Amino acid sequence: MHVQEAFKINKPLVLEEFGLPRDSVKFTSNTSTVQRDRYYRAVFDIVEKHAAEKGVFQGCNFWAWGGFAEPQHLFWQRGDDYMGDPGQEEQGLNSVYATDSTINMIKEAVSDINQIIQKQ
């Protein structure tokens, strides 16, 4: 519905807050991200296709940046690292850590989308 409405009024959309837990729904930074990387790649492909065809999706914002944080408890407690996941959610649930393979994919997608938009 949002896509059709944005198309009707000629306004861009940003696909935001998409994310997926790490493989086996584990939260530590050493857990693999194969399934999440596939999901992110599919999302980036859609946004890149729309950008190239001057479609409505012109950007995206993943959820959530975990950086160098490391979950210390299942749910946030005073003194724990701040992560992208809110305190009422499992810490590390959707966090993209600075050491994840997902980072390179994000960098490539950002570069590709920027190049497409700059050529228009």
Question: Could you tell me what each predicted segment is?
Answer:
Residues 1-26:
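Glycoside hydrolase catalytic-domain groove-lining segments
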Residues 25-120:
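Aromatic-rich peripheral "rim/lid" segments of glycoside hydrolase catalytic domains that contact
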